[in-house]
A protein has these predicted regions:
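Alpha-helical bundle regulatory/interaction domains
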Residues: 1-99, 109-114, 128-132, 136-147, ...
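Short, hydrophobic/aromatic alpha-helical segments in well-folded domains
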Residues: 76-77, 126, 152-155
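DNA major-groove recognition helix of helix-turn-helix
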Residues: 106, 118, 155-157, 168
Length: 174
């Protein structure tokens, strides 16, 4: 498995505490596990058969999530930002922190600010709908919080580098 690559996805608020550093430092980068967590990297030596590698990856994932608790405030914030009408100022007030603190905590635990988190969550809702076989792009756009289908198209191009129709086709919908 020399040169093999993998990725980790954390639920909002869990990545920073699990890795022990602000995720904003890792955004848009490929980082070697040995640079982040040498002890865990040693669990994944160079050449493994696929079954052993999969077991070790699951072990590493379990250790990463066990290393530190998620920022529960950010987890709550991500649920609130799932509402496309939510505003950062209102969410911060609901959680009992300033808007500036909200931005900092989001950057540290998620890797980007609340507005970008809201965009990502909206895009994930769109992808979930097309994965479920929904092909009415205009209806999906309205349902998940885009102002119109053109807004969905711009955001899809930015997030995935594809039009919504092409993304749906590649994911098996439509």
């Amino acid at each position: 498995m020399a040169g093999a690559r993998g990725a980790a996805r954390f639920r909002p608020g869990a990545g920073g505490p699990a890795l022990g550093l602000p995720l904003s430092e890792l955004r848009d980068q490929r980082v070697d596990l040995a640079d982040l967590h040498p002890a865990l990297a040693r669990l994944l030596p160079g050449t493994l058969d696929l079954k052993t590698a999969a077991g070790r990856v699951l072990d590493v994932a379990g250790r990463l999530t066990a290393d530190g608790p998620a920022d529960n405030a950010v987890a709550h914030v991500s649920r609130m930002l799932g509402d496309p009408r939510a505003r950062a100022e209102d969410v911060a007030g609901e959680v009992g922190i300033s808007t500036r603190q909200l931005r900092r905590r989001c950057h540290d635990t998620v890797g980007y600010g609340p507005k970008t988190l809201q965009r990502v969550l909206r895009f994930r809702r769109f992808v979930s709908r097309i994965d479920a076989g929904d092909v009415d792009l205009a209806a999906i756009a309205a349902d998940v919080g885009y102002s119109d289908q053109a807004h969905l198209t711009r955001e899809c191009a930015e997030m995935a580098g594809l039009t919504p129709a092409v993304l749906a086709r590649l994911r098996g919908a439509g």
